[in-house]
UniProtKB/Swiss-Prot annotation:
It comes from Thermoplasma volcanium (strain ATCC 51530 / DSM 4299 / JCM 9571 / NBRC 15438 / GSS1). Endonuclease that removes tRNA introns. Cleaves pre-tRNA at the 5'- and 3'-splice sites to release the intron. The products are an intron and two tRNA half-molecules bearing 2',3' cyclic phosphate and 5'-OH termini. Recognizes a pseudosymmetric substrate in which 2 bulged loops of 3 bases are separated by a stem of 4 bp. This is tRNA-splicing endonuclease. The active site is at Y231, H238, K267. The keyword Lyase applies. The gene is endA. Pfam families: tRNA_int_endo. SUPFAM superfamilies: tRNA-intron endonuclease catalytic domain-like. Its EC number is 4.6.1.16.
């Protein structure tokens, strides 16, 4: 008679221990009529720790278990379990806690998964966990952020002249607006539209205006692969933020790349979109560890 069952897979507890030892030592599964019942994550965890053995084919058992779970979610489960958390999975989300604390959540994504950015604001877990195709794991944290600057950006209407497809002005502007071009200041499309009093066109231009209204200095983020680089004020020696405007969905690979670039230049990576008519900002950062 086998010691335990997991989704129809029979197994035995190793080293002469019984089912109650597993429940007491590892806080996994439950015992009913002398049989240890495990969920697929618990079963994989104990198997790879050498605490249980399968009665039938190892390969067929592992194929069945990983078809229910995934290598990526199992990796996240193991990381959390080894840190002493109580861990369980529910509908693709992994929850973990210590003792009676409120559970925290982890969603596991692969590098080429498509992400609905709107869910960062409505269904955001505490952490995202990725395992790349080489098996390396990275932890991400996502926090909604209220960006605020120190500038009084009341910019009056000015005259703009076009030379070719570029915009220029000789009028007085904040020194950070535009780029000096001989006796003119060369303006971006967004800057020119603003000082001419035109309505914004598209989400990116709405975000540009919103950041200005928050007292920030806003410049192009092109060389970083983002829409904007944002300074909290004139006293800022370097931009504090890189901001990417997202219409709908993103491949996680793009998010990961953007976060890495921002981190390498000591800036915070911000993604923004419009939810129910309001501009929202989230900061995505890499975390060295899952800490609660």
């Amino acid at each position: 008679m086998s010691d335990g069952l997991c989704n129809g897979i029979s197994f035995n507890v190793s080293e002469g221990h019984g089912p109650n030892y597993i429940v007491g030592r590892y806080k996994l599964g439950f015992v009913q009529q002398g049989i240890l019942f495990l969920d697929p994550y618990e079963c994989l965890y104990l198997y790879f720790k050498g605490r249980i053995t399968f009665e039938d084919s190892e390969e067929s058992a592992l194929k069945k278990l990983f078809s229910i779970t995934s290598v990526e979610r199992y990796t996240a489960y193991t990381l959390l379990k080894n840190k002493g958390y109580r861990v369980h999975e529910d509908n693709g989300t992994i929850f973990f806690r210590k003792s009676t604390e409120i559970p925290r959540s982890v969603v596991v994504v692969r590098e080429y998964d498509e992400i609905d950015v709107g869910k960062f604001f409505t269904e955001r877990p505490d952490f995202y966990f990725t395992v790349d195709e080489e098996g390396d794991a990275t932890i991400y944290r996502i926090d909604e952020i209220d960006i605020k600057g120190t500038e009084n950006n009341k910019i009056g209407k000015c005259s703009v002249t076009d030379f070719g497809d570029r915009h220029f002005t000789k009028d007085d502007l904040p020194h950070w607006m535009g780029t000096k071009f001989h006796e003119y200041r060369m303006l971006t499309d967004f800057e020119a539209n603003l000082i001419e009093g035109k309505e914004p066109k598209g989400m990116a231009e709405e975000v540009y205006r919103d950041l200005l209204s928050r007292g920030c200095i806003v410049k192009t983020g092109f060389k970083y692969g983002t829409n904007f680089r944002v300074y909290e004020g004139e006293k800022s020696e370097h931009a504090e933020y890189l901001v990417s405007v997202v219409e709908n969905k993103l491949i996680w690979y793009y998010i990961s790349r953007a976060v890495r670039v921002a981190s390498s230049v000591r800036k915070k990576m911000i993604f923004t979109t419009i939810i129910d008519g309001k501009i929202k900002y989230i900061m995505i950062s890499r975390s060295k560890d899952i800490v609660i």
